[in-house]
Amino acid sequence: MLGQMEPAELQCTVAVERLNPAGQAIKRQLIRKGTVTLGRNEFQEMILRVHDGKAPQNFMLRDFQLFTRFAKDGKCTVKFVPENTQVLVSDCPPDRLKMFLKTLSIKHQASQSSKPLSDREKLRAGLPRAFETVSPLQLKDVEKANELRSRVNAPMQPRCLAERPVNKVLGDRKQVKRPRPDCDASPVKALHPNKKPVLVLPVAQKLSKEQTAVLNAVLSGKNVFFTGSAGTGKSFLLKRIVGSLPPKSTYATASTGVAACHIGGTTLHSFAGIGSGSAPLEQCIELAQRPGVLRHWTSCKHLIIDEISMVEAEFFDKLEAIARSIRRSTEPFGGIQLIVCGDFLQLPPVTKGKEKANFCFQSRSWRKCIHMNMELMEVRRQTDKTFISLLQAVRVGRVTEEVTAQLLKSANHCIERDGILATRLCTHKDDVELTNENKLKQLPGVVRMYEAVDSDPMLVQTIDAQSPVSRLLQLKVGAQVMLTKNLDVQRGLVNGARGVVVDFQPGNQGLPRVRFLCGAVEVMKRERWMFKAPGGLYLSRQQLPLKLAWAISIHKSQGMTLDCVEISLARVFESGQAYVALSRARSLEGLRVMDFDPRVVQANQDVLIFYKRLRKERLLMQSSMNDFVGQSNKENSRW
């Protein structure tokens, strides 16, 4: 299984190129299903081994260059300078490649303390040829690498040429001083002789047992639907799933542009290429056969769909039929593995007509497409058990006297602090825009404008649909703002963090300085967001990672955690909307509910019946579930 591979081993597409003195490829061997292994030979020298299933090729990791700009897309290049050869890795699960590169970098750095043997010494040793895969990274490797770095960082002492440090991973000194623009900073900078940051042992954020169960089910090839209440780590798990699958055949999608941006994907409608999907099936199949769209459908082996609750049943059935038709397969969804995520007790499907839209689980093809239904039970966003219980009750439409009393009492909460006001969650987009515009106008002082830099101004509408930041941002001193990107998790500078503009830097740019609720004061600089467009095109937007935060819509708040939030539920018009709004708050103390009416708390009865059936089936299937979970899931609420 893919998930059980060693961190020093990759399964991917590999190309081995022999280069002429000008750096051009004169011979190329392509291995579609190759294995790349990091190991040591009989002299404990580090070796990169490429195996095509027949005969291995070994490359000495001595004088080489590492190009990792596209590591996030599962690609990297290792160039062996003396041999005039380069190994190009592609279609590798990004998370696995990231760990492989860190292992290579730190292990190589740690091995520089030993003096290399000469060819004569190797002949005299007479050792039989050997190859052993390197062990996983340990603390001693990091400590050894840091010790060597500290020596390099020490003041230079006069020395003879014979005392020069042995080869650098990045090649000769000229290349180190002027690194190529396609060299990513992560593993390369870690080995830069002039800049030696302290290394730490790379540790991925640990998955819970139930999250691990979902990941293992996905890696075993099952079609999986996993659900859970707000704050159970669904989006976090989806990112781990995306990073664990081969990029070329994996398509991450979501029902909304904002949700798609969170997982680094595109909208489901953009992937499908059939517009709104309202056309007859035959016409939709024709639309999906256009060259750019057809490539999506034929190359896709793993389709991820986030926020499935907002996907309508008829649209899902059409996609399933299109997949079978285009891929010429009778298997459900044309044999594509489905990884579906969402909470049907949150926002329902969007429909423009008066006719009621059905949920995905009510579609004809749902049961034959989904092999496993799994539920995340552990709430991670909130830690207060009382607040968690309140949210669980609201989620299923159960409003007790105690819940009502707590929410009515919250109207008196004073949640403003250090000039940072509560963000008002609104049910309608128009209310949000009007509130933010009026509040900004009421502030004294000059408006500062910040225009986004887009990679393709002709496709600005596509970017707008997926971007968490606007084309034009207007700010004043005192403007209430919200961070739209994780900048420094340790300091609390995370997506959704609240702040206020305190001043602007002098000069043409006039960058804003923001004081955040966590206590940090930060000068905000432009950040870049990448988006996937139809046809495999990548788009980008550079903008300040801020948005006005006097008000925000409930739809736009999905996936966010807010420190101080004010909610008016008077105009709630959809089932699940009240729950989504309330569950954005990190704590009950940071929540203020105005004009609360228990009648606005609604849960769709069809969804409740579906979840009850899902839980019964899960209990019946528990013996097979244990293969993935290791132990029975515990429930934290009773319906």
Swiss-Prot record:
Q: State its cofactor.
A: Mg(2+)
What subcellular locations does the record give?
Nucleus; Mitochondrion
Q: Record's Gene Ontology CC terms?
A: mitochondrion; nucleus
Q: Which InterPro entries match?
A: AAA+_ATPase, DNA_helicase_pif1-like_DEAD, P-loop_NTPase, Pif1-like_2B_dom, PIF1_helicase, PIF1_RRM3_pfh1
Which BP terms from GO are recorded? DNA recombination; DNA repair; mitochondrial genome maintenance; telomere maintenance
Q: What is its EC number?
A: 5.6.2.3
Q: Could you tell me what this protein is called?
A: ATP-dependent DNA helicase PIF1
Organism of origin: Danio rerio (Zebrafish)
Name the gene: pif1
